[in-house]
């Protein structure tokens, strides 16, 4: 056991020699009320401070008892600034005989990945092209203008209404990809400007909450496809995913829905309802319950603008129906694109892998083309995005060949597929998981 196991959090000055710890002891501090983690072989007690973590206490808590070095590097842009907040939390370091990686994680893969990150920095791949993002914002605003002009010029008949709805759904989908860029701090050097524009895009252009998105999405990036850590695989008993969950449900005789038919009812309750029903309700309730008043003000500005614009054409009730029809269309786009990279991959309990291996196990790519890039917001490069979440999306294709080479060196599968096959694989994955559930339900 290491020395200093009862060190208090918040010690600002540690007298030499600094207390040392073994992994065996560090791994015990992985509770909600007792959290340690390791960054660059330094041990930090984040128990009380985690509630003040700007990215949310859950995302940092998911690394309690582990080495979080690569996650730390991946999520933060200004490392020197962030390290100022870490100094009071420092309680010691790893014992000299201890490996830098916990639980037997592959140190060679980690070393090679960090060298790859250094190469990306040397290639200036973390520098953004401001014009790229400005043009994306401009084409979103242009679509909003075209939508209004269509109704103004042609009237509110069925055909102009449907055309306008599709234009606005496209605008909303593209705004979703754009807010994703700012949310990941990948546009401006200063985090503050990314946060400000993120609130504008997700709040004023989409009517959603930046804090809600951060809370969910950063957890997804930290622990992708890990049950109880990645909120994106929490399907609220509506679907069973991967191989472990359906078998567990089957063994326990859990049958909230006929999961052997989930690949069929997915079309009825997945793409159509996620945004207009579940997300819309969850976002509003989260802003109110958690008192995200600034986010709520931004969202109100979106709804105010929308209803001022469209009540003259449809009235109050008609505008509400029109809004939800747009959400309905956007939801299909969002669900298919976001699920094609993850739901078909490994979904399991915590395996405690290194950063590189964990991201490759949970993500796959879709072939590059101008349409695929635009349609998916460059999330067709999901592997590279997960490895380097702060890298501007227009540079992801530049690092992809080097990522592929690193995968080949270590025998890690790098999956890339055509768009249509990626979409089809979603259904195949749901069918497979449903059959695993049925077999376990009937025979185990």
Curated annotation (Swiss-Prot):
Xref: Pfam families: Cyt-b5 (PF00173), FA_desaturase (PF00487)
GO cellular component: endoplasmic reticulum membrane
Motif (Histidine box-1): 180-184
Keyword Transmembrane helix in record: yes
GO molecular function: acyl-CoA 6-desaturase activity; oxidoreductase activity, acting on paired donors, with oxidation of a pair of donors resulting in the reduction of molecular oxygen to two molecules of water; stearoyl-CoA 9-desaturase activity
SUPFAM superfamilies: Cytochrome b5-like heme/steroid binding domain (SSF55856)
Short motif (Histidine box-3): ranges: 382-386
Transmembrane segments: 123-143, 148-168, 265-285, 306-326
InterPro entries: Cyt_B5-like_heme/steroid-bd, Cyt_B5-like_heme/steroid_sf, FA_desaturase_dom, Fatty_acid_desaturase
Pathway per the UniProt entry: Lipid metabolism; polyunsaturated fatty acid biosynthesis
Cytoplasmic face residues: 1-122, 169-264, 327-444
Protein family membership: Belongs to the fatty acid desaturase type 1 family.
Protein name according to UniProt: Acyl-CoA 6-desaturase
Provenance organism: Bos taurus (Bovine)
